[in-house]
Amino acid sequence: VRTDALTSHLTPTSLQQIMNDIDATLKEAYNATSTIVMPGSGSYGMEAVARQWATGKKVLVLRNGYFSYRWTDIFEQTGIPSETIVMRGQPTDNSSTPQFAPHDVDEVVKTIQREKPAVVFAPHVETSTGIILPDDYLVKIAAAVHAHGGLFVLDCIASGTVWVDMKATGVDAILSAPQKGESILMFYIRAISLT
């Protein structure tokens, strides 16, 4: 007789083991200190992160295409930050169908140094333009925002399996979503200390 045959996948021990496995996998893959899997869409996770660290503060958004506009959309609808600075991706030429590139990293760093935003929000991968921010770009942004005590939040919803090492790049918080009604948030030490 198998007594475990009637054990539901929703029993507390089974669900707890699943959540523990997800936590361990995410920590290992992203070199994260802490993780949260929360019910709600990617937009829900974005708003939760914004409310946690950007309420009443100046923020900088790197907008590399249509989907990274979502940060600005959330901010305009909710009034979470006191001020939003936006730096957009740029076309690489003047053709009718140009490629796009992220805003020049040196200009972004100078803007961070001058404006001192409390949080910098950026998309790791922008689906609509095909832009991916390379690790060296992330490192420079993180160093600039950390120099005045700010946080760096990276939207990895479209990153797929392009893992970001939070410790190596200096990213403080990563937001992702499997598009199944859940948001995944990962944090490194600095983000946890500021909650």
Regions picked out by a protein language model, each given a short descriptive name:
Residues 2-48, 52, 70-74:
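Conserved N-terminal alpha-helix of the aminotransferase class I/II PLP-enzyme fold
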Residues 2-5, 43-195:
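Conserved PLP-enzyme active-site core in the AAT-like
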